[in-house]
Amino acid sequence: MDSAAAAFALDPPAPGPGPPPAPGDCAQARKNFSVSHLLDLEEVAAAGRRAAGPVSGPAEARVGAAREPSGGSSGTEAAPQDGDCPSPGRGTKRKKKQRRNRTTFNSSQLQALERVFERTHYPDAFVREELARRVNLSEARVQVWFQNRRAKFRRNERAMLATRSASLLKSYGQEAAIEQPVAPRPTTMSPDYLSWPASSPYSSVPPYSPGGSSPATPGVNMANSIASLRLKAKEFSLHHSQVPTVN
C-alpha cells in the first residue's frame, strides 16, 4: 500500500478526456457516415468498456492510472477517442469509397430477395436483418437493394401504363374512324337560285285582283264563260221579244 501511494505521489495522474466536440461539427460529420458505420462505432465503444472491467473503489482506480505508462491510454478512454468526430476530409474520402463499392449478388441471393419483395415492398428492420442473415449479406446492403428494386418497379409500372394507354387510344381511334359515317360535303348554291325571292308555300297561286290584270284560274274562267253565255242568252231573248214581227 505504501509503494502504491509513493508511485501515485511521483507520477501525476493521467489527463482526463478532452472537451466534447462542438454540436455543429458532429452534425456535419454524421452526414458523411452510414448507419452501419455508426453501429460499428457503438460496438467498439461497448468492447472497450467490457475490456476495462468493473472498478471496486477509487483507490484502485488511482493505482491503475499510476501504473500505466505516460504515452498510453486506458481502455475507458479509447471509447471517447473512437467516438470523436473525424475530420471532414476523411469522411468525404470514406463516403466516396463506399459509393465505388458495388455488391454482386449470386442467383440464390437474388431469388431470396425477389421472393421477399413479392410479399412486401417495404420490409421492416426485423425482416431485413433476418433476410441478411439468410443470404449472408449486411442489413445495409439488403436495404439498398430494396430501394433500387422499388425504383425499378415504379419505372416498369409507368412504362407499362404508358404503353397500355397508347394502345387503347390507337384502337379507339381506329374503331371511331370505321364506325363514323362520312359526312356529306356541303353543296354550293347557284347564283340564279339565290336571286329568287323567298316565297310562301302558297305562292304558286296568284292572288286575286279585281282589275283582272292577273290571269284567272281554269275554274274561274269556266264560271265566267257560263255566266257570259247566260247573259248573252238573256240579252238575245230580250232583243228577240222587242223586235216587231212583219205580217
UniProtKB/Swiss-Prot annotation:
Positions with biased composition (Pro residues): 12-23
Highest taxon listed in the record's lineage: Eukaryota
Pfam family, one: Homeodomain
Region of interest (Disordered), ranges: 1-31, 49-107
Matching CDD domains: homeodomain (cd00086)
PANTHER family reported for this sequence: PAIRED MESODERM HOMEOBOX PROTEIN 1-RELATED (PTHR46385), PAIRED MESODERM HOMEOBOX PROTEIN 2 (PTHR46385:SF3)
Family under the similarity heading: Belongs to the paired homeobox family.
Protein name: Paired mesoderm homeobox protein 2
Protein species of origin: Mus musculus
Lineage of source species: Eukaryota, Metazoa, Chordata, Craniata, Vertebrata
Gene: Prrx2
